[in-house]
């Protein structure tokens, strides 16, 4: 029973753990970008490191189960490598520098709704409004998106969860200095373009989930697929960077926060994340994976206050409550879906017993006719005796 409970909890624990990993990435990359790291170069280094780390595991563990590569699968992997590692992440990096780390993670909270709609369009998800579980998925998604929009569109008064003293020690070197004066004015100026980039990034992320789900059905080797996505992302990202980044000094990297940002985001948020979400996706579907993303904004907001000295507004607090309620509503509906699917599979596995008639070999029929003949003769004899009397 204990082992069965742990197996049922694994998908939930895996996705919650990944949100902590993503939250750390939001903060670390924000610091790296503020220290002058080029976002195109960061994306290339990130996936180069992820490829180098994951490739040995893929070569060893999946050497006997790796499917044959076809041209169609190769095109899908190439598209996956462009959508998430190149397009998605660069839109995110630019959008985050124009807004904030908390806002960047908040706009990603519409990911469950977009993924849900795309999953219905591509028949990866079904909705039956006569079923409570389907209504729960729809209502939960709406609540989650409402919370995300509330965090995005309404700030409200600042809520001081943690009060920092003095504020004089921040200096110009660090994250705190960018929030004052000219830095705040520049951020307000680019807020709308940054928001559009972050929303475009979210659509790309949802499309990545859907395409990854289809690709896993044809190429069911999660480690190998992760390695190939990161490799294609590295190659395609390098091609884009060579065109957009003319200053070769931008490629220089030392043992500093920039290298740490590339290594952390590459190993945790690309290598491990692609693999984990692939494993969970094969069992629970892309909507289940996307549903946990709103938890990241709560973690990021807390880290943003402590690490980046960002402010928490009332809209973020109320939006967080909406997100949590919506998240658990969707998870409840998906849990019911999984239970119904398991019950259907169990029923299919049971042997079907039907009443079997004995095979008539001819002897049974003859015996039955003989018995009826004897009964008829006895009845006739009895009638004759009564008449004689």
UniProtKB/Swiss-Prot annotation:
Belongs to the drug/metabolite transporter (DMT) superfamily. Plant drug/metabolite exporter (P-DME) (TC 2.A.7.4) family. Keywords: Membrane, Repeat, Transmembrane, Transmembrane helix. Residues 339-361 are annotated as: Disordered. InterPro entries: EamA_dom, WAT1-related. Its main location: membrane. One of its GO terms (cellular component) is membrane. It is found in: Membrane. Signal peptide: none annotated. It is a multi-pass membrane protein. The keyword Transmembrane applies. This is WAT1-related protein At1g21890. GO terms for molecular function: transmembrane transporter activity. Residues 23-150, 205-331 form the EamA domain. It holds the Pfam family EamA. The chain crosses the membrane at residues 13-33, 40-60, 73-93, 102-122, 142-162, 191-211, 225-245, 260-280, 287-307, 312-332.
């Amino acid at each position: 029973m204990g082992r069965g409970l742990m197996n049922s909890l694994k998908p939930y624990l895996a996705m919650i753990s990944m949100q902590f990993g993503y939250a750390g990435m939001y903060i670390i990359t924000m610091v790296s970008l503020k220290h002058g790291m080029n976002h195109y170069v960061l994306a290339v280094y990130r996936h180069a490191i992820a490829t180098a780390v994951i490739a040995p595991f893929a070569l060893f563990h999946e050497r006997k189960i790796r499917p044959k590569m076809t041209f169609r699968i190769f095109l899908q992997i190439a598209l996956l490598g462009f959508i998430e590692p190149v397009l998605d992440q660069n839109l995110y990096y630019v959008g985050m520098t124009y807004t904030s780390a908390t806002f960047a993670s908040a706009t990603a909270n519409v990911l469950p709704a977009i993924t849900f709609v795309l999953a219905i369009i591509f028949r990866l998800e079904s909705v039956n409004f006569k079923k409570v579980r389907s209504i729960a998925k729809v209502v939960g998604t709406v609540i989650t998106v409402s919370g995300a929009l509330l965090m995005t569109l309404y700030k409200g008064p600042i809520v001081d969860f943690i009060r920092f003293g003095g504020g004089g020690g921040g200096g110009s070197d660090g994250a705190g200095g960018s929030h004052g004066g000219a830095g705040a004015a520049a951020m307000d100026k680019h807020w709308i373009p940054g928001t559009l980039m972050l929303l475009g990034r979210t659509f790309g992320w949802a499309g990545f989930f859907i395409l990854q789900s289809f690709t896993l059905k044809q190429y069911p080797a999660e480690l190998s697929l992760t390695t190939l996505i990161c490799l294609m992302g590295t190659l395609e990202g390098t091609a884009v960077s060579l065109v957009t980044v003319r200053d070769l000094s931008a490629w220089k990297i030392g043992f500093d926060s920039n290298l740490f940002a590339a290594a952390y985001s590459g190993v945790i948020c690309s290598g491990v994340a692609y693999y984990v979400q692939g494993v969970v996706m094969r069992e629970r579907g892309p909507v289940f994976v996307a549903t946990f993303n709103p938890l990241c904004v709560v973690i990021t907001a807390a880290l943003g206050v402590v690490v980046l000295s960002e402010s928490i507004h009332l809209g973020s607090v109320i939006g967080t409550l909406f997100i949590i309620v919506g998240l658990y509503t969707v998870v409840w509906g998906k849990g019911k879906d999984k239970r119904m699917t398991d019950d259907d599979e169990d029923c299919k596995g049971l042997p079907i017993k039907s009443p079997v008639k004995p095979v008539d070999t001819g002897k049974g029929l003859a015996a039955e006719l003989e018995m009826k003949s004897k009964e008829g003769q006895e009845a006739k004899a009895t009638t004759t005796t009564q008449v004689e009397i």
